[in-house]
Amino acid sequence: MSGILHLFFIFAQNFKYMIRKLYVLILSLLVATSLYALESDEIRAVWLTTNYRLDWPSVAGTTPRVIERQKQDLIRILDQLAEVGINTVFFQSRIRGEVFYDSSIEQQSQFLTGSNGVKSDFDPLAFAVEECHRRKMTCHAWMVCMPLGGKKYIARHALDKTLARNREFVTLHDGEYFLEPSDPRTADYLADIAGEIVSNYKVDGVHLDYIRYPEKAASYPDQQRYARSGKKKPLAQWRRDNITHIVYTIYNKVKSVNPDVQLSSAPLGVYNGRFGKHYYGWNAFEAGYQEVERWLQEDKHDFIAPMMYYKGAMFYPFVIDWCKRSYGKPVVPGLGIYRLNEPGSNWDLNEIEKQIWWSRHLGASGYALFRAGNLLNDFPALLWRIRYLNE
């Protein structure tokens, strides 16, 4: 009997060992699968800002010497981004009524040319697309949609003609001019710009920014327009429908030109202010009138990059919330690495590293860093960590 018990004990020990080995094998396969998905599918993006020449170009002008400097600076930036594993660039192609490409609709930015009303022989968007593709990176044309600027900005950038040409669908609010969301001509105007880009450039996507109502929307002067609409729905839903109409018009235009070009946007970082026991006033649905969940559900977006420039309890629960609302579309949390520079912000490099790690494990499809200059110029230690996380 003792011999039988001894054999049973050996079998039991070996069985437990085999189960442990099987568990380790399965876990290893899952990890390997996860790593493969990370390498092949994850969106690792950066916003490359041209407004005020924050990231690029470092110099403005149209002489051959300046143009060559602009090209070399952009090559250097893209080389550095590719080296640390960034695979997606949101290249700011339209700012406030000005563009960084050869357009028949809007003028080239003085941040590129150095002067108003001047056209450069250099086409930055074409160059950015070519150089991104050379590095196996995707390039998305980043469009700032609604704001045109204040009176001083309009004068300084000689946008008075643009303003006058579109005056019937422009609204002055809190000292700033905005394309009017409720006027159908706004949707057509922005769709024409997106269509022009997709028709003339081999971009991988069009990325919409500021596709919302402005701050202090409670005092936004659209009451007469709302009254003329017949007030058939609440003001808030009427506004959301206005933004949705713009998004859908742009989407339809982009896909009609090239179905393979993606449409994405950067909504506000919190979707709905009523979250658990708390209320967050600055949110996409109620403050910006962005009905993002509807856009995703009705297949009018390919992915989103919400601007989640917060940390801790203001970050992680909302990653989960966005993923739950995404209807299977990729969610790419926008990380505010510029916060590391803010006095008294109490941010450190570990925070960004944790946000990337947790985003990957909470169901997100990558991350987007705001912005390129902060990553490449301000935080060399973060640059090293990003490279490590992307390997």
Please place each PLM-identified region on the residue numbering.
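Catalytic domains of carbohydrate-active enzymes, especially glycoside hydrolases
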Residues: 72-98
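Aromatic-lined substrate-binding rim segments of carbohydrate-active enzymes
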Residues: 95-143, 230-257
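The substrate-binding groove and active-site-proximal loops of carbohydrate-active enzymes
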Residues: 54-68, 107-121, 174-188, 232-243, ...
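Active-site-adjacent "subsite" loops/lids of carbohydrate-active enzymes
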Residues: 41-43, 49-71, 141, 146-196, ...
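Polysaccharide-binding and catalytic clefts of secreted carbohydrate-active enzymes
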Residues: 86-87, 126, 135, 158-160, ...
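Substrate-binding cleft of secreted/luminal carbohydrate-active enzymes
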Residues: 292-293, 297-315, 332-391
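Active-site clefts of carbohydrate-active enzymes
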Residues: 50, 262-280, 322-352
